[in-house]
Amino acid sequence: MKILFFTKKAAVLLLVFILTAFSITQVSAQIIRAYAGPVYSDNLKGGHTMFGNAILQRTSGNGTFAVGTGGVTATVGNDNSDMVYIDVDGVVSTFNSSSADLVLPAGTNTIKFARLYWGGRIDDDNSNYANRGTVSIRKAAGAYATVNAGVQIDQTLLTGDQYAYQAYQDVTAFVNTNGAGSYTVANVATTTGSVGGGGNYGGWALVVVYENLTLPYSSVRVYDGFVRVENNATQAIQLTGLNAPGTPVLASDAYMSTMAWEGDGNLAATAQNPAGDYIKVNGTAVSNAVNPITNFWNGTISKNGAHISTKNPNLLNQMGIDIDEQEVGVGYGIDPNDTQIDIEFGTESDQYFPSIFAFSIKSKPPLVTLDKAVISDQIPLLALDPSENLIYTISGNNGGGGAAHSCVIVDTIPSALTYVPGSLKILASPGGFASPVAKTDAIDGDQAQVATFMGKTYLKIFIGTGAVGGTGGVLQPSESYTVQFKCLTPPNANNLNSVSNTARITGTSTDPNDPFVDDGTALIGPLGSPLSVKMTSF
C-alpha cells in the first residue's frame, strides 16, 4: 500500500500532533496477534511444506488477468486497480476459487499437522462479511468440505469500514486422508473492485507437516501471528521453542517458509528508505532470485528463488499473498543449540501483514557403536582350557552428529563363565578417564557395578561425561570409550568348543528424544557350536 502525505504546513502540524498523542497506541497496534510459542513442535523423520494461491487478481481492462504485470519487475499492483474474483473450479455454487498442489516426498507420508489460513480485505457492509470465518476445500475434483474458523479470526481496521483479516482452522484429518495433489479453496470472503490505500486482495495458504520414515530426523516448528507493518516502520518479533542441533548445520539442513498478506511487487526501495521492504533473520536480510533484498514481500509464491508453478491460476504476482520458502542453514545466524530466532520486518511505504512461519532443521542424532573383542592369556589357542583367563574389551564411539545421553553398557556373563572379581576397568571414557581406572564391583557411586539377577551375573558400566553410579553420561560426537574385564572358564572347559558373549550399549538422544541400542558379540574357541547367551535387561 502506498501511503500519501499532505504537504500543507497545517496538515503536517496536525499529523505530528496526532502521532505524538497516540504514539504508544500506534506502535502496540502493529502486533494484532502476537507470535507466542510454536503452534506445532516435534522432532520427526520428515519436514514441512506450505502452499496456496490468490483469490483475487487484477484485470487488464478487457476482462483478462494482468498476468504479465507480475514478478520481480512489477510496475503496477492492486492499489486502485480493478480486482476481480478468481474462479477456476467450474462449480456454480462457489463465487471464487483457486487451487495449488501439495507436493510430498516419495514414499509413505503421514500428515502430522495441517492448518488452513485464508483472508483478505473486506468491508463490514459486504454481504460476505459475516461469512469470513468459513470457506470450502476439496481435493482434485472431489466434493467440497466446509471449514469453519470459529473464533479464530484476526482482523484490524484499515480505514472507514474496511478491514484486513485472516482466519484459520486445523484440517489435519482432511489432508491426511487425501494426501498429495491439487487442493482447491473456495468462497473466501473479500471485497472486489478498486480502492486506494493498498487495494483489495485475498488468498489462502496451507501449512503441512509430514512424517516419512525414509527421511532423516528434523526439528519442525510452526508459528503464527498477525502483524501490521506499514508507513516506513520496522517491527521485531522473536520466535521461541526452536531446537537447533548441537553441531553446525549445512545450508540445506534448515529451511524457512513464511506467508504474508498484501505485499506489493511494485513498491520497493526508495531514496528515502533504501532498505525497502525486507525480512531479516537474526539480523541478516533474506533474499533470492525472485525475492529481492529490498522487496522480499512482492507477491511471489516461490521456493529457493524459483517461482512455484503448480497452481491455478499460475501468476507471478499474486497481488495480495506471499508464500516463500528459503534455505537458512548458513548465513542466517542459526547456531548450535539455538532455541530462538529473531525476525525483523521493515517497509518503505508499503503495507503488509506477516502471518505464518515454519522451520525445519535437520537433527543431528548420535550414532553410538559397540564392538567387543576377547583374547586368552594362553597362546596358541587350541581349545578352551580349565580355569583359563579370558580378557574382554568393549569399545566404541559416537560417530553421529548429536550428543548421546544416559549411555549405559550392559553385559550378561554366559553361565559357563565366571566373572573375575575386581577385574573391571574403564580404560578410556569422557569425563576424566584418560588412563585405566579400576572400578569396584559394588553397587555404589562409581561408574560400574556387578550384580546377579535370576541366576545371571551381569555388568553395568556407566560411561560419558557426568556418569555416576546408576546414571549414564554424555558422549559428544567423535568421543569414544573402552572398558575391560576378565572371566574364567569352568573347570570342565574341555567340554566347550567355544564361548559367545554379547554386550549392549543403550542411551537416548535429545534431538530427537529417541532411544538407541547397539550390540557387540565376542566369540572365542575353535570352530564349533557357540555357547549362546540371551541379553537380559536390568
Where are the regions that the model predicts?
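Short beta-strand elements of extracellular/lumenal beta-sandwich folds
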Residues: 384-413
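Disulfide-rich extracellular domains of secreted proteins
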Residues: 28-366
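Extracellular/luminal low-complexity Ser/Thr/Pro-rich, glycosylation-prone repeat/linker regions
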Residues: 346-373, 482, 489-538
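Short, solvent-exposed loop/edge segments of extracellular or virion-exposed proteins
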Residues: 371-380, 424-427
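Short, solvent-exposed loop/linker segments at the N-terminal edge
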Residues: 246-250, 379-388
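Low-complexity, intrinsically disordered segments enriched in Ser/Thr together with acidic residues
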Residues: 323-330, 457-497
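Bacterial Sec-dependent N-terminal signal peptides
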Residues: 1-31
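A surface/secretory-pathway sequence property marking extracellular, secreted
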Residues: 408, 412-468
